[in-house]
Amino acid sequence: MGINWNYPTTMWIGENRIEDLSLACKELNISNPLFVTDKDLINLDLIKNIILRLKKSFKNLATFSNFTGNPIGENVEEGVKVYNTSTCDGVIALGGGSGLDVGKAIAFMCNQSRPLWDFEDIGDYWTRADSSKISKIIAVPTTAGTGSETGRASAIINKETGAKKIIFHPKMLPSIVILDPLLTLDLSPRLTAATGMDALAHNLEAFCAPGYHPMADGIAMEGIKLIKNSLIKAFKNGKDIDARMDLLSAASMGSTAFQKGLGAIHSLSHPVNGKFNVHHGLSNAIFMPYVLTFNKSTIENKIISICDYLNLNKSFESFLDWILELRNNLNIPHKLSDVMDCNNIDLEKLSLMAFEDPSTGGNPKKLNQNDLKEIYLKSISGELFK
């Protein structure tokens, strides 16, 4: 049995570590970085101050921010043009999942001869890339959700099909990660909830995924516990620095752990994100109890095994009740139909997209297209599997 274990990169953690950004560039021999963040962040005073500090070290600092949530392939192509015309030699990716994913994809694609979609996470497609031409990446998350800072992939939407594609290469893992909780203090309660549930989905699906990976299991368990202890605290008091640090850590841990696998929560979410622009963390939160109850026969013993660690009664029902209570306390809608118009959606097409998503193969219970369609129907009606 041959299994490769890949774990995080260099991580600089703590308050005010953002002030070490120029030092991080120096350590990686980056002399002309491209600063990537989304258009919602670029005009914030916090980000303006970061850019001003960087310009003291890099007078001709180039920036790219022409994208928002759920980025598309064209955003990456435009960023690559900025990178190359500015003769950059590295990327600083700052933001939530979108900013990190776009920045990583730009660093990956800046010198490749093949189109982006040729590197989708299918089989050995990643070997098509010229790994010697992938630029160094520094990742700075401003939300605690996707954990893209410790991931080796980017989620990018193919505008023509509406499908969210995973672009993968081992060298897309950032070389230095800066986790500074001060950058997350002004995150709204709504985004704190959605991104926190995204991190929970990563840790939970990694823990439940089939296969032998005790290192990932241990990291995922602690990630779930950090979220259980701190998500409500940060939701109620955004300035709780310890809770914010816990959530940043849990997000990075989730992305680290899910190399073991993801499952139906993510494969159901990706089509909804791509076709209807629903926030990824929010859709993960909505689908979570429906997928848990669908998978119950396969994961019940696994779930019971962590209940003691989470100070829950030792039963699947106790864990499910915690998830439902957590969602309620975070004002997460119970049904998919609460966040989008489900009256005229093509469930056949949506369930086929979910079935073809790479995450489906990591679900602990084998799935077919009809299973995924049934979970969609349950999430629309609000009825959990018995």
Question: Where are these predicted regions, by residue range?
Answer:
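Carboxylate- and glycine-rich phosphate/diphosphate-binding segment that chelates Mg2+/Mn2+
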Residues: 152-260, 370
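C-terminal catalytic subdomain
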Residues: 262-315
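N-terminal amphipathic/basic leader segments beginning at the initiator methionine
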Residues: 1-28
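Glycine/threonine-rich beta-strand-loop-alpha-helix active-site module
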Residues: 74-181
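N-terminal small/polar loop signature for handling phosphorylated ligands or for N-terminal nucleophile
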Residues: 42-115, 233-244
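Glycine-rich phosphate/diphosphate-binding loops that line cofactor/substrate pockets in enzymes
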Residues: 19-34, 52-57, 85
